[in-house]
Amino acid sequence: MRIVSLAGGIGGARFLRGLKAAAPESDITVIGNTGDDITLFGLRVCPDLDTVMYTLGGGINEEQGWGRADETFTVKEELAAYGMQPQWFGLGDRDFATHIVRSQMLAAGYPLSAVTEALCDRWRPGVRLLPMTDDQTETHVVIEDERGRRAVHFQEWWVRLRASTPALEIALVGAASATPAPGVLEALERADVVILPPSNPVVSIGTILQIPGVRDAVAAKTVVGVSPIIGGAPVRGMADACLTAIGVETSAQGVLELYGADLLDGWLVAEEDAATSLEGVAVEARPLLMSSPEATRDLAAAALELARKVAA
């Protein structure tokens, strides 16, 4: 089976680990979100791509779900001693090496897709990991604070402000002129099924779908999504703040309607959200918490089984 999964960071990466276990013989391509990407200390940082790469490659900090295992922060401490900003984004020493390699390759003229492939040569994630685009796109958030109405990078809103300042608008800067990275549309064309894992529907999955041509290519296939909302609350993170910013209810129903019947064929929800429905979409209730490798594998298997049902 040829599977394509769109993915953000922690939730998407953990689901993908279960997907590999549920379909070990399948050809899996992952289209990763790059809207979170940011330049820090002169280095290009790709948080979601790296989280997928580290998680599937066995190098992730399992407790927090991002960053490297056995990490140290000597460089961060030294930068802080010099007064270098920003200090709210913590890059570890091992993580710095990834960003240095990426930035040197980008400066040498390699596209992000080629750089990502080279980085994965070390980590062997067991999937083909593609950025959604080679073009620089960044998610920015419009807020209003003591400095007035202004736009900040998504990472500043998410990490420094912890989404505590309401988002007035969320925009993917550069999306209109971006093109899918090499291999993205080809993978979607060949796919037997497309999976939308329980990643943030606004700034992860939604961002990928904003790249021209991607949503149409996804919608042409059998598509099953997994709700990132259980009982009216995000499984993790602050997806509720993102949904509120675009006027969508924080519920499995709200996210289902956001994606729409033109995109989804199947939708997995938690058992307490079993009443969720939308004409044209097959909805099934399953345990959604990825509380163990076995539970995560079973969730991925349920998504694939639903895909088989709706494709029949």
Language model segments and positions:
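Extreme N-terminal starter segment of soluble prokaryotic enzymes
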Residues: M1-V4
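Short, conserved loop/helix-junction motifs that constitute active-site signature segments
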Residues: A21-S26, R215-K221, G260-L263
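Short internal beta-strands
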Residues: T29-N33, T222-I229, D265-E271
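Electropositive, gly/pro-rich neighborhoods at or near active sites that engage anionic ligands
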Residues: G32-L172
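Active-site glycine-rich loop that binds ribose-phosphate moieties when present
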Residues: L168-A187
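An anion/phosphate-binding loop that grips the pyrophosphate of nucleotide cofactors and donors
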Residues: A191
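Redox- and metal-dependent alpha/beta enzyme cores, enriched for Fe-S-associated oxidoreductases
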Residues: I208-I246
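C-terminal functional extensions of proteins
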Residues: R236-A312
